[in-house]
Amino acid sequence: GKSKWLGEQYVREVCPRTFVVRTAWLYGYVGGNFVKTIWKNGAQKGELKVVDDQMGNPTNANDLAYHILKLALTDIYGVYHCTGTGVCSWYDFACEIIRLAGVPCRVAPCTTDEYPTPAKRPAYSALDNAMLRCTVGDEMREWKAALAVYVEKLKKAGGPQ
């Protein structure tokens, strides 16, 4: 958090005519991500534990790219939050992934304390896209709608690779 913020401040000092775009919980077609990991692990294990006390905004990489392009066509520089619309927990996100993928898997909620990771994560990292809405005049897709399209495309391609 702090090092990212310091980097943003430095960039804005050096180049005031810049866009700082913040996103969260990003997933896309290239490389690994939470969606592919949950899908694969759910299919292999049949049971998963996922934290339900961390909240955020799942964000489709194509949606992010589209909105960054729209921003770049303006000269309204500044800091923008650019995330999928709506807030959920990692548990909610995982349940929706498993449901859409049609994977026979039980997803159980757990707390952050029960699922330690090397990096400490904030309990609430959801962002509000108000500045983006005011600037480009539209909203990022609702996270469930974007996820449904993504999962459908992955299914047609043979599932997560």
Residue ranges and their predicted role:
Residues S3:
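Active-site helix of classical SDR
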Residues Q9-G56, D63:
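NAD(P)-dependent short-chain dehydrogenase/reductase
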Residues N62-K70, K144, A148:
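Amphipathic alpha-helical segments that line or abut small-molecule/effector binding pockets
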